[in-house]
From Swiss-Prot:
Main localisation: membrane
Record lineage: Bacteria, Pseudomonadati, Pseudomonadota, Gammaproteobacteria, Enterobacterales
Family per similarity comment: Belongs to the UPF0056 (MarC) family.
Subcellular location: Cell membrane
Membrane topology term: Multi-pass membrane protein
Record's keyword annotation contains Transmembrane: yes
Transmembrane regions listed in the UniProt entry: 8-28, 45-65, 71-91, 105-125, 134-154, 174-194
UniProtKB keywords: Cell membrane, Membrane, Transmembrane, Transmembrane helix
Name of this chain's protein: UPF0056 membrane protein BUsg_434
Organism annotation: Buchnera aphidicola subsp. Schizaphis graminum (strain Sg)
A GO term from the CC aspect: plasma membrane
Length: 196
């Protein structure tokens, strides 16, 4: 039971729903509330599928493709860095490079914001550590996923509270934080790569 609680808390912290909330708000701010909910649910379902795949066969996929976990970390850092630059210096098309009529699909919401390299690597490590307790791992993942989706579905409420200017300010602030996180993720991948 303690393992389930600690694993669930670990997964929630890595998914970081509160940290991702301003990014989700920024990317989805031009969509109406109903469409925003649909997109959040769709992206979270995609993220859950990816997480379950990595939990069960992640290491095998990387082995088949001859990729190391460091590669996942480095590439995730690069993607997040590019997203952060667009958040700090938004173009007329919007911060995610789509027009106001378009909406994100798969990248960047499902991957790498929710199902990011850190989470996918953690799931692979947990699947080795608790090889004979897979039902508990799946349960922990589902609880953490449910907690995250509830917080992200409340993004509309936060949009009403902060308004457009508040969201723009949060966007730039989160962009700065995201640049630091992505750089750290990239450097961790490089460091691990050199160690191996």
């Amino acid at each position: 039971m303690n393992e389930i609680i600690s694993t669930t808390i670990l997964l929630i912290l890595i998914m970081d729903p509160l940290g991702n909330l301003p990014i989700f708000m920024t990317i989805l701010k031009k969509l109406d509330a109903k469409r925003r909910r649909i997109v959040v649910i769709r992206e979270m379902i995609i993220a859950l599928i990816v997480m379950l795949i990595f939990l069960f066969v992640g290491e095998k996929i990387l082995t088949i493709l001859n990729l190391k976990t460091e590669t996942v970390s480095i590439s995730g850092g690069i993607i997040l860095f590019l997203i952060a630059i667009k958040m700090i210096f938004p173009s007329d098309e919007g911060n995610n490079g789509t027009s106001s009529e378009e909406e994100p699909f798969l990248v960047p919401l499902a991957i790498p914001l929710v199902a990011g390299p850190s989470l996918l690597a953690t799931l692979m490590l947990l699947s080795h550590q608790y090889l004979h307790h897979m039902p508990y791992l799946v349960g922990s993942l589902l609880i953490a996923w449910f907690f995250t989706i509830i917080i992200l579905l409340l993004s509309g409420l936060f949009l009403k509270l902060f308004g457009d200017k508040g969201v723009n300010a949060l966007e730039r602030l989160m962009g700065l934080i995201l640049i630091m996180l992505s750089t750290q993720m990239f450097l961790d991948g490089i460091k691990a790569w050199f160690k191996n």
